[in-house]
Amino acid sequence: MSSSTPVQPPAVGRVYLVGAGPGDPELLTLRAVRLLGKAEVVVYDHLVSPAVLNFVCPTAERIYAGKRRNEHTLRQEQINALLVRLAQEGKQVVRLKGGDPFIFGRGGEELQTLAKSGVAFEIVPGITAASGVSNYAGIPLTHRDYAQTCLFVTGHLRHDPHVGNDSNSADISGDIRADLDWPALTRPRQTVVIYMGLSGLADICRQLMAHGLAADWPIAIVQDGTLASQKVLVGSLADLPERAKTAGLTSPCLIIVGEVVKLHAELAWFSPDAM
């Protein structure tokens, strides 16, 4: 009777779509930290804070797949194909995205590709920038006296020829006027949060005023929210674009529009120096 070595079944790969939160690594979920510590490959985006990568297993392969305006390391189709290939090779892959992967992160599109290819996947939510950054800026998104509705908006849309086809790009470009529902953005008693809006700030403010908001309507812009480098500028639709330019703000920035912005002076608590 001959003996033979048992044939090992092929390793089964899996992709974990993980939200990295708004920047501060202490805002990661426990599950995100655990998965980063055991992943074989981590494919991460531009908006992932470098401090978050400290949780990655030292032996894991790290693949940067970030996109900025006019600077794409990999096209989206290449990223999709990469995730499929790694999983089919039997790897345990973390696809790491800034904020929450299902809010302006193209996570849904990537998972559609995995599903069509028969690749197993799981989703780990993260704190989206609107929530994390507004909290660190001391600006509640809803308040009984000011706002019962909150809208999340991105100025970077699918067909934008200047930026490319990636909502994780760090900024917007081109004419956004025809793409946003401006009347909806100027309704009373609501807060509007605009992702990736720094380069379009002047146009955004002009359009909001043209569609009915007062020139002195409160608006804030936050750079590097939740990080030690966080900067918060509060002003009006009329003056904030010039003030932001003078301050030399750079991406990533988040814009918050609405009367809740007035609460920043009272509720600001975050001191980067105390981190």
Stretches found by the model and what they are:
Residues 45, 65, 124, 153-155, ...:
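Generic beta-sheet signal
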Residues 98-188, 231-234:
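Class I SAM-dependent methyltransferase SAM-binding "motif I" and its flanking Rossmann-like core
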